[in-house]
UniProtKB/Swiss-Prot annotation:
Gene name, Swiss-Prot/TrEMBL: trmA
GO BP terms, alphabetized: tRNA methylation
EC nos: 2.1.1.-, 2.1.1.35
Aminoacyl-tRNA synthetase is among the record's keywords: no
A Gene Ontology cellular-component term: cytosol
Keywords, ordered alphabetically: Methyltransferase, S-adenosyl-L-methionine, Transferase, tRNA processing
GO molecular function: rRNA binding; tRNA (uracil(54)-C5)-methyltransferase activity, S-adenosyl methionine-dependent; tRNA binding
Family: Belongs to the class I-like SAM-binding methyltransferase superfamily. RNA M5U methyltransferase family. TrmA subfamily.
Name of the protein this chain belongs to: tRNA/tmRNA (uracil-C(5))-methyltransferase
């Protein structure tokens, strides 16, 4: 995405094109009317990753054009939060003033939240020592006069924290506040305002549900915690250890006690639920204690594997959140044989790109 395509005046036209494309692609499944949730036109991304270019004494941010592969200089990054844009030039000037901080620096990552917290990760092609730490603390102290900021230094097999490596996001969802720990260098929803709308849509889809919820690919508990109030119990799976720990942190932060998170992949859980394998990680969990009538899946771009699709078909209600319309369509070729689409949504997580985040709610025929 080159920055000239970030065109707020053309946003509605581009969104209409996404809606038209999604409607055409899924017409074969005869879904209900598409619900569309727009993004803020600017400053919608809570994170950004920018390369750093060295040119003599000069130092500046760059990005690469995906088509031409040519680098271009970046002074501001309109998709990123206003906080990140305000910080970018101030941070760069301080880094430029320090030979220790600028030497072998090749990338700066930003992770912000709606409350004004920001984590800055400085990535290096060198090992970091005590001299680096002294300089990092110096510029942090300077930036704390203007920003609620923390720093991380990264190099090969090295990570140095200046206090902590996460922000606490606060989302307004269905009349309630939800708090989420979001850890640097792990997956989080990039578009906070669209995430709020996505969670509210999922809550509305499942509002009168019976029994329990099973969620695969739960991440940091983004959906599990928001939907917990609609179910007796929630059983959630996630393969990434930092995300599991973050989900447990978030449960405590929000006072939610009817969610259980287990560390295993969707494929492993399919084997467990089918009785094909026993897992030590499930030794304290009796799967028969859960009466899961509803399943939520939010898979990676590759979608659901064939065995997981078959397992998902056993549930009365399926809530499928997808970041890849092509794999969603492929999975629906099977799921639509046993289930009917009752809700169909587009969440514009990634404005000015071809990517569409979609949601479908299916009920067994």
């Amino acid at each position: 995405m080159t920055l000239q395509f970030v065109d707020p005046e053309n946003y509605e036209t581009l969104l209409a094109a996404k809606k038209e494309h999604l409607n055409k692609q899924f017409a074969i499944f005869n879904p209900p009317a598409l619900e569309c949730f727009a993004s803020p036109k600017l400053h919608y991304r809570m994170r950004a990753e920018l390369r750093v270019w060295h040119d003599g004494d000069e130092l500046y941010y760059i990005m690469f054009d995906k088509k031409t592969k040519q680098k271009f200089r970046v002074e501001q990054f309109p998709p990123a939060s206003e906080l990140i844009n305000n910080l970018m030039p101030v941070l760069l000037e301080l880094v430029k003033s320090s030979e220790i901080l600028r030497y072998k620096l090749f990338q700066i990552d930003f992770l912000s939240n709606l409350k004004g917290q920001v984590i800055v990760s400085l990535l290096y092609h060198k090992q970091l020592d005590d001299n680096w730490l002294v300089e990092a603390k110096r510029i942090k102290a300077e930036l704390l006069k203007q920003f609620d900021i923390n720093f991380i230094g990264r190099a090969r097999k090295q990570k140095i924290l200046l206090d902590y490596d996460y922000v606490i996001e606060e989302l307004q969802v269905d009349g309630n506040k939800l708090f989420y720990q979001q850890i640097e260098n792990s997956f989080t929803q990039p578009n906070a305002k669209v995430c709020e709308k996505m969670l509210e849509w999922a809550i509305d889809c499942t509002r009168d549900s019976q029994g329990d919820l099973l969620e695969l690919y739960c991440g940091n508990g983004n959906f599990s915690l928001a939907l917990a109030k609609n179910f007796n119990k929630v059983l959630a799976t996630e393969i990434a250890k930092p995300s599991v720990e973050s989900a447990q942190f978030n449960m405590a932060q929000n006072g939610i006690n009817n969610v259980t998170v287990i560390r295993m992949s969707a494929e492993e859980f399919t084997q467990a639920i089918n009785g094909e394998r026993e897992f030590y990680r499930l030794k304290e969990i009796t799967l028969s204690d859960y009466q899961c009538n509803t399943i939520l899946v939010d898979p990676p771009r590759s979608g659901l594997d064939d065995e997981t699709v078959k397992m998902v078909q056993h549930y009365d209600n399926i809530l499928y959140i997808s970041c890849n319309a092509d794999t969603l369509s492929r999975n629906l070729e099977v799921l639509s044989k046993t289930h009917e689409i009752k809700r169909f949504a587009l969440f514009d997580q990634f404005p000015y790109t071809y990517h569409s985040e979609a949601g479908v709610y299916l009920v067994k025929r």
